[in-house]
């Protein structure tokens, strides 16, 4: 229905590849235990190699950057085709002819990308704080706040992935 930027998607592919390779290296070589989950303050335990903490955090930052850029580019493409009010289906609340039909897939993706972009920014702030603590171990943060940021970032990401996956299934089903 829309055309995202091919160049940006290729750049995102490289960022995602680097992020995944970094996480694999931190986990398998550096024995970084928390994996991608990284519930605070677990990443800063001294059970694994110190470098693996930084590699894991930077890797998830690369992944988050790629996801945020992709989300924003999809939103840009949808707004370019359907307009801001059109992508959210507001035309159906007005009297009269709504004009061009909004495919359900576009509405689902638009709403998912708005939620995803907002919570990916929360995840970016959280990861910058993780990076700051890795560079300056004397820093300490509120564990409950960090836990909530991890959950908001991670669970929203998983949910929008499910929503978009279900939208693809609906799109493929015969009408």
Feature roles, as predicted:
Residues 1-175:
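Hydrophobic alpha-helical transmembrane segments of multi-pass integral membrane proteins
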């Amino acid at each position: 229905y829309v055309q995202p930027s091919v160049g940006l998607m290729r750049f995102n592919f490289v960022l995602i590849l680097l992020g995944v390779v970094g996480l694999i290296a931190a986990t398998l070589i550096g024995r970084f235990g928390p994996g991608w989950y990284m519930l605070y303050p677990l990443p800063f335990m001294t059970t694994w190699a110190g470098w693996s903490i930084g590699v894991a955090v930077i890797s998830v930052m690369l992944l988050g950057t790629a996801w945020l850029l992709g989300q924003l580019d999809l939103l840009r493409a949808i707004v370019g085709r359907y307009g801001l009010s059109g992508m959210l289906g507001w035309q159906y609340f007005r009297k009269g002819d709504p004009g061009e039909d909004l495919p359900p897939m576009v509405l689902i993706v638009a709403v998912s990308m708005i939620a995803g972009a907002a919570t990916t920014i929360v995840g970016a702030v959280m990861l910058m704080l993780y990076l700051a603590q890795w560079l300056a171990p004397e820093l300490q943060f509120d564990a409950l706040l960090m836990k909530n940021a991890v959950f908001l970032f991670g669970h929203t990401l998983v949910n929008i992935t499910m929503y978009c996956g279900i939208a693809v299934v609906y799109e493929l089903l015969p009408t």
